[in-house]
UniProtKB/Swiss-Prot annotation:
Record protein name field: LL-diaminopimelate aminotransferase
Source organism of this protein record: Lachnospira eligens (strain ATCC 27750 / DSM 3376 / VPI C15-48 / C15-B4)
Entry GO MF terms: L,L-diaminopimelate aminotransferase activity; pyridoxal phosphate binding
PANTHER family to which the protein is assigned, alphabetical: AMINOTRANSFERASE (PTHR43144)
Annotated function: Involved in the synthesis of meso-diaminopimelate (m-DAP or DL-DAP), required for both lysine and peptidoglycan biosynthesis. Catalyzes the direct conversion of tetrahydrodipicolinate to LL-diaminopimelate.
List of residues binding pyridoxal 5'-phosphate: 72, 108-109, 132, 188, 219, 247-249, 258, 288
Cofactor(s) demanded: pyridoxal 5'-phosphate
GO biological process: lysine biosynthetic process via diaminopimelate, diaminopimelate-aminotransferase pathway
Listed HAMAP family: DapL_aminotrans_1 (MF_01642)
Summary of subunit composition and partner proteins: Homodimer.
SUPFAM superfamilies, per database record: PLP-dependent transferases
Residue sites binding substrate per the record: 15, 42, 109, 132, 188, 288, 384
Signal sequence interval, chain numbering: none
Modified residues (N6-(pyridoxal phosphate)lysine): 250
Length: 404
């Protein structure tokens, strides 16, 4: 008789955003006349930049001719894209990252879930609390998190690093030493950031205790303040302790195109074994490469026109963030984020739970957001709104919320 991976049975309910989708669909079916504004899931709404569309058209045309047709992509990504990433995202910032330390994939979500394949199940993970739920859920699937404790909304074998208003929604070094540390800055969901000096403390700590940092920098393009690092490799010693995850979804609107990359320096080792070699083996075995046309589109993001056009889109979303932030403040809400990230983190009013406020906004204002408790136990009593809607819908949503 075959057996299943019973770690999946430990997972509570469905994935956060799947649960939200089901609740919204049920409400819409019962109230077909209501116009629902979605400021929940972090999906973009603006079209792809013209430079990206031009690259897609050109590469699709190439696929129509035998002499320029491309089949399977190289395991680790085409050289033209990896070089563009290394030059623009790292060398221009003074970071020693080479093209052959970059692994192209179909997105940061896939990589954040798959990176655990190269680590022993015995490793203990530490996560910011609250944080993107994929980190914990995928480690639970692998059997790394112990048992789920419903009354605590937490796992028994996870080191939670509370990110609360008292700490400016940034984590403090954990008292219990973990093996794998997940950091996400600018943070999803709180929108918080840390300075380069603060990040350096984490790098020094990881090197001291022999931990590895998995650094999710999916939102680095939204950074506006000069003392906030765009990559962990701006910190001295990061090459020996850090893996960085990046995405084209938020900086270039590739949510429907799918492209990302992971950086693993060759200096990052466990004993004599490089994590670079392990991930290369895993990547080559389980992934057949991002499509040629998508990688050409990614290359176009780094062109002069691509940078200008995607920069304008980022400014559009950050104007939405400013609108939400200022609108909620004027309505008396306690809010943060929205400065270096497209997320606004607000305290629920009248001591409502996160899900109570979700239902309240949906039913009374027909606005969808994300319950903070879905990101971890310290997210209870908070709520996330995204700036990825249209400006018109953002303004309309704020008018409805302020009228409550």
């Amino acid at each position: 008789m075959f057996k299943i991976n019973d770690n999946y049975l430990k997972l509570p309910g469905s994935y956060l955003f799947s649960t939200i989708g089901k609740k919204v669909a049920a409400y819409q079916q019962a109230n077909p006349d209501k116009e629902i504004i979605r400021l929940g899931i972090g999906d973009v709404t603006q079209p792809l930049a013209p430079a990206v569309i031009d690259a897609l058209h050109k590469s699709v045309d190439e696929m129509g001719h035998a002499e320029t047709f491309h089949g399977y992509a190289p395991d680790l990504g085409y050289e033209f894209l990896r070089s563009a990433i290394a030059d623009h995202d790292y060398k221009k910032r003074g970071c020693d990252i080479s093209a052959d330390e970059i692994f192209v994939s179909d997105g940061a979500k896939s990589d954040s879930g798959n990176i655990g394949d190269i680590f022993s199940v015995d490793n203990k993970i530490a996560v910011c609390d609250p944080v993107y739920p994929v980190y914990v859920d995928t480690n639970a699937m692998a059997g790394r998190t112990g048992d789920y404790i419903p009354e605590k909304q937490a796992w028994s074998n996870v080191v939670y690093m509370p990110c609360t208003a008292e700490t400016n929604f940034a984590p403090e070094l954990p008292k219990e030493t973990p093996d794998i540390i997940y950091l996400c800055f600018p943070n999803n969901p709180t929108g918080s950031t840390i300075t380069k000096d603060e990040l350096q403390k984490w790098v020094d700590y990881a090197n001291k205790v022999g931990a590895v940092i998995i650094y999710d920098a999916a939102y680095e393009a939204y950074i506006s303040e000069p003392d906030v690092p765009h990559t962990i490799y701006e910190c001295e010693g990061a090459r020996t302790c850090a893996i960085e995850l990046r995405s084209f979804s938020k900086n270039a609107g590739f949510t429907g195109v799918r492209l990302g990359f992971t950086v693993i320096p060759k200096d990052l080792k466990c004993g004599d074994v490089t994590l670079h070699s392990l991930w290369a083996r895993r990547h080559g075995t389980k992934f057949n490469g991002a499509p040629y046309i998508v990688q050409r589109a990614g290359e176009a993001v780094y062109s002069e026109a691509g940078q200008k056009q995607t920069g304008e889109q980022i400014a559009y979303y950050m104007n939405n963030a400013k609108t939400i932030l200022e609108g909620l403040k004027s309505a008396g809400y306690t809010v943060s984020g929205g400065v270096n990230a497209p997320y606004i983190w607000l305290k629920t009013p009248d001591k409502m739970t996160s899900w109570e406020f979700f239902d309240y906004l949906l039913e009374k204002a027909n606005v969808v957001g994300t319950p903070g408790s879905g990101f971890g136990p310290s997210g209870e009593g908070y709520f996330r709104l995204t700036a990825f809607g249209s400006y018109e819908n953002t303004v309309k949503a704020l008018e409805r919320i302020k009228a409550l």
